[in-house]
Amino acid sequence: RICYLAPRDTQICAPGQEICYLKSWDDGTGFLKGNRLEFGCAATCPTVKPGIDIKCCSTDKCNPHPKLA
């Protein structure tokens, strides 16, 4: 699987990691900064705490930055 690890950087995931994910959350820095983002690969869709959004998918490059998609 090939997943984004940053807005424009991709990586071939390790064996067994067939899920790409994009986590987003408000870090409390205010309107101008917006949400924080975390991109990655995983074996299963990660569990997140309340207030954190996560999108998981299972095709190559399926977790792009929302503004670059």
From Swiss-Prot:
Localization per record: Secreted
Tissue: Expressed by the venom gland.
GO molecular function, one term: ion channel regulator activity
Cysteine pairings via disulfide bonds: C3-C20, C13-C41, C45-C56, C57-C62
Pfam family, one: Toxin_cobra-type
PROSITE patterns reported for this sequence: SNAKE_TOXIN (PS00272)
UniProt-recorded name of the protein: Toxin Lc a
Secreted recorded as keyword: yes
InterPro entries: Snake_3FTx, Snake_toxin-like_sf, Snake_toxin_con_site, Toxin_cobra-type
Membership in a protein family: Belongs to the three-finger toxin family. Long-chain subfamily. Type II alpha-neurotoxin sub-subfamily.
Other observations noted: Has the length of long neurotoxins, but only 4 disulfide bonds, as short neurotoxins.
This protein's record includes keyword Transmembrane: no
Keywords, comma-separated and alphabetical: Acetylcholine receptor inhibiting toxin, Disulfide bond, Ion channel impairing toxin, Neurotoxin, Postsynaptic neurotoxin, Secreted, Toxin
Transmembrane segments: none
Function: Binds with high affinity to muscular nicotinic acetylcholine receptors (nAChRs), whereas it binds with a low affinity to neuronal alpha-7/CHRNA7 nAChRs.
One Gene Ontology CC term in the entry: extracellular region
